[in-house]
């Protein structure tokens, strides 16, 4: 099967965005909550979704998301608030919350409280002072550890200090077993408002090298017996 190659270094930003967001899918959605303090205190609480997001490790537990910058090159409210206070929350988005999450991406004026405008109820944090979306099936409490800027790409790394999980998704709290399907999370597909469910799943067991050798040898012996 043939492939088409795109030289991204020779393409404008709009083309790179279209190609990559349509290819790197599905992407989990970070519904990021922040609160201004000090010089940015006037910004108040901000709630915004980002699909340039992922879990980066567990020792320490780290997530990363990329809020980028505004069209005029200035930081978005999320980045400004985190830069001043360091704390933020990531509410994960279920199918039931997808519509209101999408509304929170509206280009509200700087400093406008999206949660208040949209009637989104918030729940207080335990390890951080920033609230999270009360109806979210899961939420992460984070503290910024590093922000990396590459051109107009701004990547915020946050250590996860606390995790909220809806009770019906916790199968065994002592053994830390989670019913992932019960979270009913959605992901981003492409860059123009297309989303996906996470309900259609399949499992593949991880093999040890010894198990792989055994299977490979059995297959080789089967191939020879057919000749």
Swiss-Prot record:
InterPro entries: Flavin_Rdtase-like_dom, Split_barrel_FMN-bd
Cofactor: FMN
Keyword Flavoprotein: yes
MF annotations from Gene Ontology: FMN binding; oxidoreductase activity, acting on the CH-NH group of donors, NAD or NADP as acceptor
Key words of the record: Flavoprotein, FMN
Pfam family, one: Flavin_Reduct
Top-level division of the source organism's lineage: Bacteria
Family: Belongs to the flavoredoxin family.
Protein name: Uncharacterized protein DR_2585
Species of provenance: Deinococcus radiodurans (strain ATCC 13939 / DSM 20539 / JCM 16871 / CCUG 27074 / LMG 4051 / NBRC 15346 / NCIMB 9279 / VKM B-1422 / R1)
């Amino acid at each position: 099967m043939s492939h088409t190659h795109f030289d991204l270094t020779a393409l404008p930003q709009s083309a790179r965005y279209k190609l990559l967001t349509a290819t790197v899918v599905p992407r989990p959605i970070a519904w990021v909550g922040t609160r201004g303090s000090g010089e940015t205190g006037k910004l108040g609480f901000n709630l915004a979704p980002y699909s340039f997001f992922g879990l980066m490790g567990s020792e320490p537990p780290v997530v990363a998301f990329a809020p980028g910058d505004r069209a005029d090159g200035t930081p978005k409210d999320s980045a400004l608030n985190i830069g001043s206070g360091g704390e933020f929350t990531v509410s994960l988005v279920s199918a039931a919350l997808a519509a209101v999450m999408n509304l929170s991406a509206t280009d509200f004026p700087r400093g406008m409280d999206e949660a208040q405008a949209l009637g989104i109820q918030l729940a207080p944090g335990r390890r951080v002072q920033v609230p999270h979306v009360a109806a979210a099936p899961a939420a992460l409490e984070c503290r910024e550890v590093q922000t990396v800027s590459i051109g107009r790409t701004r990547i915020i790394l946050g250590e996860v200090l606390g995790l909220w999980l809806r009770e019906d998704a916790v199968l065994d709290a002592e053994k830390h077993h989670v019913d992932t399907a019960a979270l009913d999370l959605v992901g981003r597909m492409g860059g123009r408002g297309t989303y996906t469910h996470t309900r259609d799943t399949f499992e593949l067991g991880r093999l040890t090298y010894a198990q792989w050798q055994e299977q490979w040898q059995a297959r080789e012996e089967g191939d020879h017996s057919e000749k």
